[in-house]
């Protein structure tokens, strides 16, 4: 065998040996499965939206067009002097059924708040008191108008979760992951409103459905505690919302930012895979 061939084989054997050693050194240990739970707070921006009002007894069937809405954070003013459930909050309860490949499922709840901007000039078209209308009204509480999903627009999603491991220290005490989430579920709004001075009785109800996509960066410390920052897109469609002597329909898109803290709860002994 020539020296050239011997050198070639030695290089190949060396590469195989090196890759085997590196593989052995970088094998990660995963639990059989893993639960996690988190709590945090959010802020939102909403698309302009239409609200359709139907009050047959009053001869009303009209729409507020391209209404502006905003959130009500609550956490930006004396957060630690109020109940933790008053500001716009979030919680997540998740289960990674395959930690090695990063697959899991999650219950995902966002206590968001949607409020029609007070004082805006709102386009109004349709039928009121049995007569056709195409006008503009000043949407303000002083003029008998308000529309609050203020104790919650309340998005509930059942998500499929995929985790991608980005960075980890050798001892696993610092870990950075990316999580992609997608889901669908009901909306459970608290409905409070008044149109032309006719106010409803504020109440919670099952009010429609929503779909969402979420991108999350998760930093885990000492294997258990974690901090998350998430960006989320959601589309919510509300129907049969109870108003004074009638119902309302409403749909809008949401861009949401979320900051949360949480804890991982591994199940089963960690094994190298």
Task: Please give the residue ranges for each predicted region.
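Bacterial Sec-dependent N-terminal signal peptides
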Residues: 1-31
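Short glycine/proline- and aromatic-enriched beta-strand/turn motifs that initiate or cap beta-hairpins
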Residues: 24-97, 189, 256-273
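Short loop/turn motifs that connect adjacent beta-strands in outer-membrane beta-barrel proteins
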Residues: 25-33, 98-103, 165-176, 221-227, ...
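Outer-membrane beta-barrel translocator domains and adjoining extracellular loop/strand segments
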Residues: 49-56, 118-124, 189-199, 240-246
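Glycine- and aromatic-enriched membrane insertion/assembly motifs of diderm outer-membrane
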Residues: 56-143, 221-226, 232-238
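Extracellular loop and loop/strand-boundary signature of outer-membrane beta-barrel proteins
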Residues: 76-79, 142-148, 195-204, 241-251
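Gram-negative (and chloroplast) outer-membrane scaffold detector with strong preference
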Residues: 92-193, 262-266
């Amino acid at each position: 065998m020539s020296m050239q061939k011997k050198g070639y084989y030695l290089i190949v054997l060396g590469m195989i040996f090196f890759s085997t050693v590196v593989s052995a050194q970088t094998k990660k240990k995963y639990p059989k499965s893993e639960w996690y739970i988190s709590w945090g707070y959010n802020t939102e921006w909403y698309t302009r939206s239409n609200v359709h009002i139907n009050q047959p007894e009053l001869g009303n069937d009209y729409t507020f067009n391209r209404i502006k809405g905003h959130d009500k954070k609550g956490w930006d003013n004396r957060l630690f002097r109020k109940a933790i459930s008053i500001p716009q909050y979030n919680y997540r309860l998740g289960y990674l059924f395959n930690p090695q490949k990063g697959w899991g499922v999650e219950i995902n709840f966002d206590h968001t708040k949607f409020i029609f901007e007070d004082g805006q000039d709102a386009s109004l078209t349709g039928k009121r008191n049995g007569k056709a209308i195409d006008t503009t009204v000043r949407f303000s509480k002083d003029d008998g108008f308000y529309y609050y999903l203020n104790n919650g627009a309340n998005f509930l999603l059942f998500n499929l979760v995929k985790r991608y491991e980005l960075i980890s220290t050798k001892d696993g005490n610092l870990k950075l992951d990316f999580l992609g989430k997608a889901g669908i579920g009901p909306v459970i709004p608290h409905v409070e409103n008044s149109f032309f001075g006719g106010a409803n009785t504020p109440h919670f109800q099952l009010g429609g459905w929503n779909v969402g996509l979420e991108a999350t960066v998760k930093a885990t410390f000492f294997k258990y505690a974690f901090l998350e920052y998430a960006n989320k897109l959601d589309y919510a469609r509300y129907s049969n919302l109870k108003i004074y002597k009638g119902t309302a329909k409403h749909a809008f898109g949401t861009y949401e930012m979320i900051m949360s803290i949480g804890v991982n709860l591994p199940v089963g002994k960690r094994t190298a895979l």
